[in-house]
Amino acid sequence: MTRLFGTDGVRGLANEVLTAPLALKLGAAAAHVLTAEKRVDGRRPVAIVGRDPRVSGEMLAAALSAGMASQGVDVIRVGVIPTPAVAFLTDDYGADMGVMISASHNPMPDNGIKFFSAGGHKLPDHVEDEIERVMDSLPAEGPTGHGVGRVIEEATDAQDRYLEHLKEAVPTSLEGIKIVVDAANGAASVVAPTAYEAAGATVIAIHNKPDSYNINMDCGSTHIDQVQAAVLKHGADLGLAHDGDADRCLAVDKDGNLVDGDQIMALLAIAMKENGELRKNTLVGTVMSNLGLKIAMDEAGITLRTTKVGDRYVLEDLNAGGFSLGGEQSGHIVLPDHGTTGDGTLTGLSIMARMAETGKSLGELAQAMTVLPQVLINVPVSDKSTIVSHPSVVAAIAEAEAELGATGRVLLRASGTEELFRVMVEAGDKEQARRIAGRLAAVVAEV
C-alpha cells in the first residue's frame, strides 16, 4: 500500500486525491492519535487550524475541523496565515495539535495537510504511520452531547500574536533598508509586508493580493525573476520571495542576483558564530546543499552536518543535537530559538538585521560562500523505488563520479511529493555539470 504521508504531510490534487471525505477521516484519526493522552480531568483537547488562500482550503478546513470535533477536540480556526504561524500558535495557545492546509509552492489546484503536535512540532514518521493505521479502524460513533468538540471560527488575535513574536525574535531596526517582497499571492500576503514595515523597512509588496486562484501563479519563490525585475525597477536594497505558505524565503541582492538558501545559511551561520549564538559551531543542511557551502563552512571553522531533504529532517537533527541553525537550499531556514519550523518572514527579518548590523549590502554578505555550478533535472518516473539500484543507473553514477573526481559530486534521489526522480550534478564547470546531468537523466528515463 502506498504511504499517504510524503515528506511534508499529505498532498495532492484537491477534490480528486485530497478529497473532503479523506480530510474528514484524517482529521478524526489525527485527533485520536495526537490527543489520546491529553484527555484527563475532563479537559477537552484543542487544535489550531490555518490555511493558505487557495480555493479548496475552506472546503478542506471544514472537513478537517468536523473530523477533529467528532473526536471531542475543540478547533480554533485562525484563517489565512503562514505555516510557521500555525506552528507558533499551536504552542502559544497551549493547543494539543495544529494543522496547516497548504500545498506550499505547488499550483493552485493542489492542496495539502500537515500536522503539528503540541509545542508546534512536525510529526515523526512513526506518528504519521499510526494516523494512517487508525484511519479506517475508528468506530463510526464518537463522543456525544457535551463530549462533541466545538469549532471556533477565525480567532481574531492570531495574526497579531504571530507578528509580536516576529518583533521579539528580531528586534533590530531596519530603518533605511528598502525591500521588495513577493508574497506569491499566498499566506504571507499580509503578514510579511506588515512585519517588515513594523521593523522600519521601506516595503514594496508585489503579488500580495490573493483571490483564491492566483497563489504561486508566475510569482513567489518558484518565479524569482519577478522579484529580480522589481528590485531593479525600484532601486531596492534587496528582494525577498516567499512560497505559498511562507515557510521559505529566497533573496535577491540590489543587482538582481539570486541569494539562495545555502548562501543565506552561510551568512547567518557566520553572523551567529560571531555573536556566540551558533551552538556547537554547527550548521545543519541537507544532501542537496551546494558543495560550496561545505567549503565555506570549513574555512569559517563551522561544522556542516547534512540530512535527507525535507525541513522536518533538518529539524530532527537540530533538536537531537541541540544546534541553532539549519535549512535547505530551497530557502527553508530554521532558527530553533525562535520557531519549530522553517519561517520565511523570520528569515527575511534575520537577513536584513545582518545588513543593518554590519552596514554591508546583501551582495557583500552573500560572498561568504562561492556557489559551485549545480544542475538539477527532474525526471518523471512511474516507479521511484527501483531507480537508484538499477544496474544501468549504478554504472552511470560510477562513470560520472570517476569523471568528476574531487571537484564535484552526483546525487540522485526520489521526490517526496511528486512522481519525479531528481538528478543533481555539481562541478567546477557549468557545462560539465550540464553534460553529466543530462547523461544521467537519460539513463534514469529509460529505466
UniProtKB/Swiss-Prot annotation:
It is an enzyme of class 5 (isomerase). The keyword Nuclease does not apply. Keywords: Isomerase, Magnesium, Metal-binding, Phosphoprotein. Its EC number is 5.4.2.10. One of its GO terms (biological process) is carbohydrate metabolic process. The active site is at S104. Binds 1 Mg(2+) ion per subunit. It holds the Pfam family PGM_PMM_II. The keyword NADP does not apply. The modification Phosphoserine is found at S104. Its cofactor is Mg(2+). It catalyses: alpha-D-glucosamine 1-phosphate = D-glucosamine 6-phosphate. It comes from the Bacteria. PANTHER family: PHOSPHOGLUCOMUTASE (ALPHA-D-GLUCOSE-1,6-BISPHOSPHATE-DEPENDENT), PHOSPHOHEXOSE MUTASE. This is Phosphoglucosamine mutase. It comes from Corynebacterium glutamicum (strain ATCC 13032 / DSM 20300 / JCM 1318 / BCRC 11384 / CCUG 27702 / LMG 3730 / NBRC 12168 / NCIMB 10025 / NRRL B-2784 / 534).
